Amino acid sequence: KKQMIFADSVRIGGDHVTSDLSSGLQIPSNTAERIKTIHGGVIATSMDDREMIDVDGQTGDWDHDRRKFTRSEIIGIIRPRIEEILEEVYHKLQAARFDTLPSQRIVLTGGASQIPGMEGLASRILGQQVRLGRPLRVHGLPQAATGPDYAAPVGLALYAAHPQDECWDFDLPEKRMGAMPMKRAMQW
């Protein structure tokens, strides 16, 4: 059955990637966000060394405002932060003993999950099947809210509106650290 069996979040995300680009390239945040969205990626190819990206600044200094960066430079700033995010996800999954649960498919949500190459890199770091989450078949949902950046809030709202009544057909792992076993907490 398709049902949510685990959910969590990390404290870092796409805004941190934008901030890294902004400080690394010394450009305004709105320009960094545009570059991340249009030219971002996590896997560099040989062509990325030749692809030049024009960056328009807003300082009034012509030489500083009209600069070019290679796509490889952009990826070189983005990838370390994405790796940090995915490693944090990996540690959360390990702490939750996710590998003992029957479904081991990970759904990435949020705007940064759309960065090209994210699914492949996530699969390598997390060692799991990964897919991009997006709200599908939601009647009345505005077009602007159908992307992965809205998948988590829309999905949680749907989950709350239509709770799953059926019982799980697997045992949850028990915590070994003296706390209430997870199984008992779920029965509560």
Region locations from a protein language model:
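Helical "lid/coupling" subdomains associated with nucleotide-phosphate turnover
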Residues: 2-188
